[in-house]
Amino acid sequence: MSEVKNGTHVREVTDETFGTEVEAHRGAAIVDLWAEWCGPCRALGPIVDDLAREFEGRVKVAKLDIDNNPVTTARYNVRSIPTLLFFRDGQLVESVVGLRSRNELAARIAKLAA
């Protein structure tokens, strides 16, 4: 089972929970693939947390630590981080690599949730 990260609206997922939490989810979901040692990932984290609050009830937001979850990382061919994976009804519809502005991500999430 995934857990809510530090009281935020973001779920921590693992290789074991990714299928049930993301791929089996009906509706919109985004997954932030990150690592503790990644500076841009640490900069993106608060933005993702804020967007999770803004889109609560419309988009499921999860984080996956790539260092501890190599199966999912390889399955989605993640080669650079941060990477955001956008899913609709369990299907990958878009991926965004690199640090992006809050406004750009909010627009992408709003489109996904529409």
Residue ranges of model-derived segments:
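Proteins that catalyze or organize thiol-disulfide redox chemistry
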Residues: 1-59, 68-83, 88-114
